[in-house]
Each structure stands twice: as C-alpha cells, then as structure tokens.
Amino acid sequence: MQNNHYHIIVPIKDSLETAERTLRALQGERVIIWNDNSTSENTQRLHELAAELQYECIDVAKLTDHPSPNYLLLLHMMRERAIQENAHLIIVESDVVVGDATISRLLREAEEDNVGMVAAVTEDDMGTINFPYEYARRYERGRIATRKRLSFCCTLMTLQLLKRVDFNQLDPDKQWFDVTISKLSRESGLTNLLLTDCPVRHYPHSSRPWKQLKYTHPLRYYWQKLFYDRDKI
C-alpha cells in the first residue's frame, strides 16, 4: 500500500521569480518553504505566497545565525519530523518546475522494496537532460537503479532511508549533502532510483548566480570556491 504521508520541502534564498514558479507548480501538495535568509522584502513575499497556496513557511533566520546555505539544519529537522510522522521526505529545489504527475510517480516508486532515494531526471526547456544528470543522457528512458549520486533537485528520501541512515554522520564542514546521502543510502543496503522518463524542468543555480561561473568563467568560479570557502560537497 502506498505511503500517503510525505512532506515536500522547498529551500529558497531569494530568486523569487523562479521560486514562485516552483511553488505554484506544486499547488495542492503539502509544501514547506525553507526560507534560508532571503531579504526582508522577499521573506514577506514568501509568506504571502505561503498564505495564498496554503503552505507552511519556516524562516531559518529565526532558528540560527548561520549563513546560508543551511542544508544540514534542514536535513536534521525534517528527518526528525518525517520519522515522527511516518512520512517520506521530498526535496524540490527552487530552480525546478515539476510536472502534474511528478510527485505521485516519486511516491509510487518509493513503495518498491529496499528503495532509499527516488529522483526525477532534470531537463532544459528543449527537453535535453541537463545538470546535474548529464551522465544519464546515455540511459534508456525508464526506472534506472544507479550507483551514481542523486541530486536533491527533485528527490524523495524514503522513510526507510530516514530511519536507517543517521544524519549525524554528515560532515558539518560541508554545505551540500546529496553525494554523501546517496552513498550512505547504498551502503545501508538500499537502492537509489533515477526516473529518466519522469523529467522536471531545471534552471540551474538561479538562486546562486555566482555558480554559473563554473560554465562561463571556470577560473573565477574555482577562485571564489576556494577563497570564499563555497560550494563544499
């Protein structure tokens, strides 16, 4: 029987144009907005959207003075909440637009035995698989069991994974944890699935424009990465 208990969390730091598109595409779902130190003006707008769409909005600035990104806090808080409520946890990034059937498909695949993570492949507006799943361009369309990392662009972590994997193993000096959790899921005996026939639209790094330098000016990107201690995965 399908587990109908789940939470969708959308981490947002400013970039309201793409974030609003993400939130509206999820209308009717159980969504938690993770407002990770957006400006006061954008925070107000996020609360307006939350009220309109009947979402919950968590202001991270009220929980910690740690600078964005606060993914580790998100993962610890939401894991505890999901376990208490016997729920799966779905992360949808604020630069992703889901389709009408995306969430139901993730949930359906999550009911297979020994599944840890289920991710929707990402595409651009032309229908070409894009970052971070370029490696999947050679795959057939369908349900792919993979040992490669799954991004948090649009990914479900099953209740089974949340119970089995202790997030206290995560390195607090890092900022992003999709690589680590993908590995821990496999090491715990679970299978990670990539759905190459269930694409979502992805507009990479809309909330962190400096990361576009990785493709346009790689030297500047790596200088900022090292000098400002950014983008640690």
Q: Each predicted region: which residue ranges?
A:
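Hydrophobic targeting segments
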Residues: 4-10, 26, 30-34
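Short, well-formed alpha-helical segments that are part of the catalytic scaffolds
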Residues: 14-28
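A conserved acidic beta->alpha catalytic loop
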Residues: 34-46
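Active-site-proximal specificity loops/subdomain of glycosyltransferases
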Residues: 53-83
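Conserved glycosyltransferase catalytic-site signature
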Residues: 71-76, 96, 103, 150-152, ...
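Short beta-strand-to-loop acidic/aromatic patch adjacent to the donor-nucleotide binding site
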Residues: 86-97
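Conserved catalytic core of nucleotide-sugar-dependent glycosyltransferases
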Residues: 99, 105-168
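C-terminal catalytic/acceptor-binding lobe
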Residues: 171-233
